Amino acid sequence: MNVTTPEVAFREYQTNCLASYISADPDITPSNLILQGYSGTGKTYTLKKYFNANPNLHAVWLEPVELVSWKPLLQAIARTVQYKLKTLYPNIPTTDYDPLQVEEPFLLVKTLHNIFVQYESLQEKTCLFLILDGFDSLQDLDAALFNKYIKLNELLPKDSKINIKFIYTMLETSFLQRYSTHCIPTVMFPRYNVDEVSTILVMSRCGELMEDSCLRKRIIEEQITDCTDDQFQNVAANFIHLIVQAFHSYTGNDIFALNDLIDFKWPKYVSRITKENIFEPLALYKSAIKLFLSTDDNLSENGQGESAITTNRDDLENSQTYDLSIISKYLLIASYICSYLEPRYDASIFSRKTRIIQGRAAYGRRKKKEVNPRYLQPSLFAIERLLAIFQAIFPIQGKAESGSLSALREESLMKANIEVFQNLSELHTLKLIATTMNKNIDYLSPKVRWKVNVPWEIIKEISESVHFNISDYFSDIHE
C-alpha cells in the first residue's frame, strides 16, 4: 500500500526513510524502528507529520518520561492499546482487561495476546504502531529492559490479525551502541545549522507573532494605518533573525531556547515600534538594541532592605530574577569548596577539635600554588564530603535560650534530611552542579562523583547574599 511522504523542512531524507519503513502492510514493516537525535532535531515533529499525512496508519503515543518507571509504562501500553482497538473497531464485542494487573513483561505479553485474540474476525491483518517518545528518558532504564521490548513481537502469535510495531525516539547514541548487533533500523536526525534554525523559526513563529495582541495594540496606539500583513510579517521575521544572530553563541542551535527568548523579548521589542521606524528595520533595531545585548536573566536575591540590589525601574522591569533557597546556596558554596579546596585541608579548616593538635600537624602545609585553582577544571568529590562541609558551614540558629536545658537538646549541626537532598536535586536540575552520571542518579550512592558547575564570580555573589565570606577559606591558595 502506498504511503504519502509529507514535506518537512530540512528533513527530506528522514521522511523518505520513514516511508520506507512504516506502512500498513505488517509483512514488510519492521517490528522495531529507532529515531535517534538530540533535543530540538525534529524527531517527534517529523513523525507526527508523517502519521498525519497517512491517516490509514494507526498509532498510539506514549511518553515514558511522564510514566517515570518501567511498570507504569507496561500498564500504559496495555491500557492505550486496548482503548485504541476498541475505538477503531467499536462493533466487535470485547472483554476489558485490567491494565493494573500488568506488573511484569510476561504479563504484558499475556494481556496483549488476550486482547488481540478478540479481533480474529478481521478480514485483513493490520499494523498498530506504538510510539515510545523519548524511551531513553525512562528513570530506571537498564540494558535488559530494552531487550525485552525489542523481543516482544517474537512472543506474540505470528498469525494474529493485529500486529504491534514499536517506534522509539531516543536522544543518546551511547544507549544505542549497546544494541548495535541487533541490526534494528535506525533513522538519524542531525542537528540543524544556524541558517536552518532561522528558517524554521521564521516559518513556525511569524504567523503567531503577527497575531499577537501586543502588536495589534501597539499599532492602534501609534495610529499606524498604512501597514499590510506582508509588512507585519517582515517585522516579525526581522525580529527572529535578530534573536538568532544575537543569542546563537549563547543557545547554540537549540530551537527551544531560542523560542523562549522570542517569547520573552517580543513584547518589549513591540513597545519600541513607532510610526517612524516600523518600516525601517535598522532604526527599529537601534531603538531596541538593549534587548539584544543580554538575556536579561540574572541570579539575585529577592530580599528587601540594605542587602537588596538597587536597580533603576527600567532595568527591573526588563529582568527576570531566580532565587535559590538558603540551603541551596550553602550547598552550592560547599560544592565549590569541595571542587577547589584539597581534601587534606578539611580537618584543619572545618574540624572543631583542631585546637587540640599543636604545631604544623594542626593545619598542614598550605603552600601558595603557581596556578590559581580557579583557572583549572573543578575536581570531583564524593557526596559524603559535600554533606560534611555543608554541615560545618550551615548556620544553625537555636530557638532555645542560650545556656538553658532546652538548648542542650538542640542539634548543633544541620542534618542531611530530605529537604537537603531536594535542594541538591534542584541544583543538579539547574546544572549548577554536575555528576559523572547522566541519568538514573542515586544521590546516596558513594560511587557517584560530583563537581561544581559555576564560576568564582557567581559563587562570590551567592556567598555575599548570605553574608558568608568564602574568600577566607582560600587564603594563601587563591591569588
From Swiss-Prot:
Compartments, as annotated in UniProt: Nucleus
Residues holding ATP: G37, Y38, S39, G40, T41, G42, K43, T44
Keyword Repressor set for record: no
Gene Ontology MF terms: ATP binding; DNA replication origin binding
A cellular-component GO term for this protein: DNA replication preinitiation complex
Keywords: ATP-binding, DNA replication, Nucleotide-binding, Nucleus
Matches recorded under Gene3D superfamilies: 1.10.8.60, P-loop containing nucleotide triphosphate hydrolases
Listed GO biological process terms: DNA replication initiation; pre-replicative complex assembly involved in nuclear cell cycle DNA replication; regulation of DNA replication; silent mating-type cassette heterochromatin formation
Disulphides: none
Family classification: Belongs to the ORC5 family.
Subunit-level organization: Component of the origin recognition complex (ORC) composed of at least ORC1, ORC2, ORC3, ORC4, ORC5 and ORC6. Interacts with ORC6. Component of a cullin-RING ligase (CRL)-like complex composed of at least the cullin RTT101, a linker protein MMS1, and the potential substrate receptor ORC5. Interacts with RTT101 and MMS1.
Biological function: Component of the origin recognition complex (ORC) that binds origins of replication. It has a role in both chromosomal replication and mating type transcriptional silencing. Binds to the ARS consensus sequence (ACS) of origins of replication. This subunit is a candidate for the mediation of ATP-dependent binding of ORC to origins. May also be a substrate targeting component of a cullin-RING-based E3 ubiquitin-protein ligase complex RTT101(MMS1-ORC5).
Miscellaneous comment as given in the Swiss-Prot or TrEMBL entry: Present with 768 molecules/cell in log phase SD medium.
Protein name: Origin recognition complex subunit 5
Classification of source organism: Eukaryota, Fungi, Dikarya, Ascomycota, Saccharomycotina
